[in-house]
From Swiss-Prot:
Name of the protein: Mitochondrial GTPase 1
GO cellular component: mitochondrial inner membrane; mitochondrial matrix; mitochondrion
Function of the molecule: Mitochondrial GTPase involved in assembly of the large ribosomal subunit. Plays a role in expression of the mitochondrial translational machinery.
One Pfam entry name: MMR_HSR1
Xref: Gene3D superfamilies: 1.10.1580.10, P-loop containing nucleotide triphosphate hydrolases (3.40.50.300)
Membrane topology: Peripheral membrane protein
Gene from which this protein is expressed: mtg1
Cellular localisation: Mitochondrion inner membrane
Amino acid sequence: MAFVARQTFEYQMPSTWYPGHMNKTLKRLKNLTSSNDIFVEVRDARIPLTSRNYVMEDFLNKKNRIIVYNKCDLADTFHTKAKVSKHRIQNLAQQFQNVECWFKETSTPEKSAFITPYVSKAPYFAKELLRLIRTLVDQASANGRVYVYFVGMPNTGKSSILNSLRNVALRKSKSAIVGNYPGVTKRISEIVRLFNDMDVYMLDTPGIMTPSITKPEDMLKLSLVGCVKEGIVHPVTVVDYLLFHLNRIDPSLYSKWSLPTNDVDEFLQNTAYKARKLTKGGFDENFVSNYVIQQYRIGRLGRFQLDTIDKNELLIRLHNEQNKKNAK
């Protein structure tokens, strides 16, 4: 009998992950920033709508903002598909908010081995972004200090982009701590000078989640790409959600480990055996689940978007977001 993938995914999720330091950071940003300041908002291209923080929208819409969709190479297998997705995101962004959108691929040595030829040179991206920031600074203020804040959800790559800009602009080693775990930055960081000839400074900020999630499935997406602290959603549930997507896209993406299956337990046991991830105690589902999740995050289980990118989906999200705001 031919394999038939699940068409729906049943789940019960935590409402959100919103530690106290996130709310403190948001309040501080609102109180400290001026009209001259620039905000670089970093989103994950695999979840371009889900990684949009509706709590910050009213605040950021009044600011000079650049949106960077990071990790584009992990969002699509084929470059032509990536271009289509970029155009869709760009068009949606231009329709609903007056911002500049940029797209960046991953650039770490570990990841680049598996995603060539889609990786763009980090220095090139940095130079172009620096040129845009200079333009915005000139437009914002003829004199006076300007701050460039890097904001977004946890683990979207804010610190890495900040360091890349600093390295290119000043030829200095990186300053912000970079980690693959959400919550590495817990407070607004030290002030870092951006240009030698301009009074412009950069600040890294902690990743900020939303106090509540507009769609329950979003917690699964955020957990899968690494925006949510490990353990908030059980790793087996995260893998089950990944398996759901893999089966709908192409079950052969995991053929090196298992035959097509909708059973996450069967999938994990087969993976543990084929990938040689059995521990001394035998089969450890959490250990194998975390291994599978990491393989997905570096592009070894296909590269695809988890969000549906269309106008209707964004309108639904905007409606749900407004309901959340009105309920306060």
